[in-house]
Design a protein with these regions (language model features):
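Conserved donor-binding/catalytic core segment of Leloir-type glycosyltransferases
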Residues: 166, 202-229, 242
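A charged, aromatic-enriched C-terminal amphipathic alpha-helix characteristic of glycosyltransferases
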Residues: 336, 350-383
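Membrane-proximal helix-turn-helix segments that form the acceptor-binding/catalytic region
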Residues: 110-113, 117-121, 145-165
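Conserved acidic donor-binding segment of nucleotide-sugar-dependent glycosyltransferases
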Residues: 325-338, 346-352
Length: 398
């Protein structure tokens, strides 16, 4: 394949072997590039047993063995990040003149140094995608004073050597410039991976329930939900809480459920199938995500596709709030205090079917303008790259 039509996407995780917003985003990016006719390599760590899986629109290249990415506390492990960065450096050095462009995740931050050094003098264009940008205090809260300060310094250094940065919120764009980016970042229009086929919006299930779907880690603040639901039940007596996922904070969440006497109205299904997740999303009164930090907020989009409004919490690190239009597709609570969150949940309940219809209408508009395809097209325009001669489509792929 000619260099001009070969692109690499580099991230240490790949959906569906690991799940999360970044995994979905980078897989979809590779698929869109392949759909546009580019020859695409996905450089990742091994996350499967047996032979490397094959994909129709991109090629999976494992560049490291299986890695233990997170500690027991849900924090990214530095040894794993360094191991992947070393694998990325070696893979790009060996292929430095194969690729017209490399799109690499800026998290973990070591990826940026590995890719920049490996591609020096090659003529390959480098795009660094920043899922999130943290200030110093966030790094210290996440990793401790010493490690957090070092991580923040490394982040600033990586941003300074980034030739083209992409991000997915005005919050991240502002932080990139504040942390030393030397050119204007490319802010994506959105990360929707095409329209999803779901039933038209319907009334919330009876009895009503608030849904949380995600990892249980301190930054997600799942443990604030039981007290909020207990407060909301003063006005909505049959309200329930359904908490999906697991993680290091699960015991703290269960302890809060016990503290507020919520055992009879709280369910912990753990991880569920895609079909069950769709069913729960479709029937939820609201999807609540009290996270203090989000780089984009794909959960808003996924819930609104089902006509389900979203309850978020205002925080300086939560870019998901940029997607919320008050009384259209959700409510932003000013704090995590039970009274404030309960008020937001009651506002959603008061919005009834009208709010559910407007949430779906928001999604229908967004799916035409806020897609990963539009984001990829913006990257290609900014580089720019020669258009590949032959365009593949999903229908043409095996």
């Amino acid at each position: 394949m000619e260099r001009s039509s070969t692109v690499a996407v580099a991230y240490d995780c790949l959906f569906p072997f690991t799940t999360g917003g970044g995994e979905r985003q980078y897989r979809a990016t590779a698929e869109v590039l392949g759909d546009l006719g580019f020859d695409v390599d996905y450089l990742t760590s091994r996350q499967w047993d047996g032979e490397t899986p094959t994909e129709g629109l991109f090629r999976i290249l494992p560049i490291t063995p299986r890695l233990s990415l997170y500690s027991a506390d849900g924090v990214r492990r530095i040894p794993a990040a360094l191991r992947y960065a070393a694998g990325l450096f070696g893979a790009l050095v060996r292929r430095r003149r194969r690729y017209a462009a490399v799109i690499v995740s800026g998290l973990p931050i070591f990826n940026v140094f590995a890719a920049r050094l490996a591609l020096l003098g090659s003529g390959t264009k480098l795009v660094v995608d920043y899922l999130e940008v943290w200030h110093r205090r966030q790094w210290i809260e996440y990793s401790g004073t010493v490690t957090g300060t070092i991580a923040w310094v490394l982040q600033r250094a990586a941003i300074a050597i980034t030739p083209l940065a992409t991000c997915h919120s005005q919050l991240s764009a502002t932080r990139l410039l504040r942390e030393g980016l030397r050119c204007e970042p490319l802010v994506s229009p959105g990360l929707i991976d095409g329209a999803v086929e779901v039933a038209p919006p319907a009334s919330a299930a009876t009895p009503p329930y608030v849904l949380y779907a995600g990892r249980h880690i301190p930054d997600k603040r799942v443990d604030v939900l039981p007290a909020a639901i207990a407060a909301a039940r003063e006005n909505i007596p049959d309200l329930r809480l359904v908490i999906l996922g697991t993680g290091p904070s699960s015991e703290a969440v269960r302890a809060e459920v016990h503290r507020v006497g919520g055992e009879s109205w709280t369910d912990f299904p753990g991880f569920v199938s895609e079909s069950e997740l769709d069913r729960l999303l479709h029937g939820a009164l609201a999807l609540a995500n009290p996270s203090r930090r989000e780089g984009y907020g794909l959960v808003v989009v996924e819930a609104n596709a089902h006509g389900t409004p979203v309850v978020l919490v205002a925080d300086e690190g939560n870019a998901a709030t940029e997607l919320i239009e008050s009384d259209v597709n959700g409510v932003v609570s000013p704090t995590t205090r039970p009274a404030d969150l309960a008020r937001a949940i009651r506002d959603v309940a008061d919005g009834g079917d009208d709010l559910r219809r407007s949430s779906r209408a928001w999604y229908d508009t967004a799916v035409g303008t806020r897609t990963i395809r539009r984001t990829v097209e913006g990257i290609l325009s900014a580089l720019p790259l020669p258009s590949p001669a032959t365009v593949k489509t999903k229908e043409d792929s095996p």
